[in-house]
Amino acid sequence: RRSGMRYDIIVLGGGPAGLSAAVAARGRNKSVLVVGNRWQDSPLARAERVDNYLGLPGVTGTELLEQFRRHAEELGADFVLGRVISLMAWNGFHLTVGSEIYEGETLILAPGVVRQAKYPGETEYLGRGVSYCATCDGMLYRGKPVAVVGRSGDAPREASYLKSLGCQVVYAAAKRPETLEEDIPFVQANRLEITGAQTVTALVADGAPIPCSGVFILRDAVAPTDLLPQLETRENAIRVDRSMSTSVPGVFAAGDCTGGPLQVSKAVGEGLVAALSAAEYLDRRGSEPPAGASSGT
């Protein structure tokens, strides 16, 4: 990635749809940043055999993803690994990934299927004790008791970061991760609830309250509709038109997040269309005269 650069297109998701979008966008000479988790974590990577991808019967999911990513890299797409914690739509789009902020003119959503039930109290206390990013908000809780809800591979590392700040950390999950520091208290729980008054006062784990000032819920991904609440959906999928445009200007979507069928070929095709539409959007906007400018005679 190129630090401090404002990208023409930021692609959220490194699966077939996102990588197809990156290839098509580079073909239109647009700068592209792909943000996602490790490609090995993609559902396609776990497919031992793919028999319905045109021209490549019997290919493994890993082989397909490796070819897709290599193609995008060779064309000059930039990549960053991490979870998108927040997204601000103002003068383009500003994405927070870990502790870094990336800027883009347009956004292509291709995160796959992100279904995640909210914990009771999560939405109510978001920003009032509930956070999705330890590196972003940890300093606010220096020296205070906090709970980490571990739902991602890097959650133990973020718990260690909070501990290094002087936070009194308790880690809650269905199973203790092997990489969790031994001196961080662990609570095994399947049912979690966040309670409080004006702000968070406790994480309730299987009925037992854990007093805390903050709860860090660390998932592998944040649902696009949580990042952009104004996104319109239909049957739990992002609503798009034939150009893969969403209800938010400058935002396009492709792949499994737009609904079924959940097929690689469909994702690749939609990624292509989304990138071409984003490029056309940029070109059209770039050709518009500045506000108040006279066309002359």
Spell out what each predicted region is:
Residues 25, 44-46, 118-123, 139-141, ...:
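Short loop/helix-cap segments at secondary-structure boundaries that form the rim of catalytic
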Residues 75, 79-143:
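Glycine/small-residue-rich loop that forms an oxyanion/phosphate-binding "nest" at active or ligand-binding sites
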Residues 22-23, 156-161, 166, 254-292:
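A conserved FAD-binding loop/helix module that cradles the flavin
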Residues 7-63, 144-178:
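Beta1-alpha1 glycine-rich phosphate/pyrophosphate-binding loop at the start
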Residues 118, 124-140, 218-265, 273-276, ...:
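FAD-site-proximal beta/loop scaffold in flavoenzymes
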Residues 66, 72-96, 102-104, 164-242, ...:
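A Rossmann-like FAD-binding core segment of flavoenzymes
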Residues 1-4:
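Short, Lys/Arg-enriched N-terminal segments with co-localized hydrophobic residues
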